């Protein structure tokens, strides 16, 4: 969408949807961004507690201040380089952690492709779905692509950029999948495989030391810290993009609407952290909230990218459109199952 139309998802929603629908969608996306910021600030704060014994609330303030300074004093290009560095550290950390455990690949490989819904697991399943396919990122990706500002009237440039972004997206998804898989494999081998119950992140960190050595617990905390910081940065940027889109404007950290969006997401998330009694449950339920909003963003994006008015000749094919609608339907069905599990 960013390449073909020159608009990000939030701008396109405001431009092509009825105002009451556009505002409802974008305000719900802002709530999703707040949920993301809550989880990511919490994750960074928990990591600071693991490393330096800093209380959660004080650590949250430090993460918040650092992220605001990063966003308000750097261009996207600079932030992009920082994010790449952070993600590289996270990936290398979990590769090292995996080298310390023995993986039962005969069990792990089938589990990668075999879905299971154990009793009472829907909250965790949906929180993982929300954490992996974050709705705010769908807004941010189109904004990032749009910000490159190429000539959208030149078909050769558009086709070249579409091929590049397709490859870039696949590579990013593979890296994300690898890091998420590494975390799950580590938890399964170190804790589940040894019959060690874990209900808190701090507990996981403290148990890694006797199981895998002191280095393992420190590296786990470092990876968690960089994951929290990098994700809080992207969540803040997404909120700025979403809020600016309500006014049919692109993300620009120098613009008041973008700044209001960033601060709204981060400050409200911080305020919620101040009243959360159980940080681990706060992480779970905030990510579950993302999965609830996800179908709204999916259906919005599919509708807009399937419109010739928005995309011109680059709109989704009929096959792609209905495949994406089916995926959105599956996510919606999972949310219905989640609701039923609470009844």
Question: Residues of each region from the PLM?
Answer:
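Loop-to-transmembrane helix boundary motifs in multi-pass membrane proteins
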Residues: 19-20, 57-60, 217, 229, ...
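C-terminal membrane-solvent junction of multi-pass transporters and transport-like membrane proteins
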Residues: 82-85, 241, 255-260, 279, ...
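Extracellular/periplasmic helix-exit of transmembrane alpha-helices
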Residues: 1-4, 145-149, 154, 174-203
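Helix-loop-helix module between adjacent transmembrane segments
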Residues: 20-40, 45-75, 130-131, 226-231
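Membrane-interface loop-to-helix entry segments
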Residues: 62-63, 71-101, 288-290, 294, ...
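Membrane-helix boundary/coupling elements in multi-pass transport proteins
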Residues: 29-48, 177-184, 188, 217-245
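Hydrophobic alpha-helical segments and their helix-loop junctions in multi-pass secondary transporters
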Residues: 87-114, 126-145, 300-309, 334-342
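Flexible loop linkers connecting adjacent transmembrane helices
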Residues: 1-21, 46, 194-209, 309-314
